[in-house]
């Protein structure tokens, strides 16, 4: 049962529902979990500080139970990142 936590800058020019859908679909596409077991939530941060040349951020944490291989985790990460990149 993965718990996906998306943290992002509130100034990000991507609607929150699209961020949640992108991460959720990336996890689902991995075929490692049943759809009913995937939990995804998002938190927007109004106050944050980044490097001088950065204005926005997206940070995704996926919490998993034990038992997933390194290869499973790498594939999961790749799929989620691919779905997020498709938003731009």
Sequence positions of predicted segments:
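Short, well-ordered amphipathic alpha-helical segments that serve as non-catalytic structural scaffolds
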Residues: 22-27, 79-83
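A contiguous, well-structured "functional interface" segment within a domain
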Residues: 1-2, 68
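Short edge beta-strands and adjacent turn/loop segments
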Residues: 2, 36-63
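N-terminal, polar/charged subdomain of small-to-medium soluble alpha/beta proteins
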Residues: 3-9, 17-24, 30-38, 42-45
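Short, surface-exposed acidic/glycine-rich loop or hinge patches that mediate macromolecular interfaces
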Residues: 11-13, 67
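Acidic-enriched, low-complexity/disordered segments with a strong bias for Aspartate over Glutamate
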Residues: 13, 17, 53-56
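Alpha-helix N-cap/helix-initiation sites
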Residues: 16, 35, 70-74
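Mid-chain, well-packed structural core segment of small domains
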Residues: 51-88
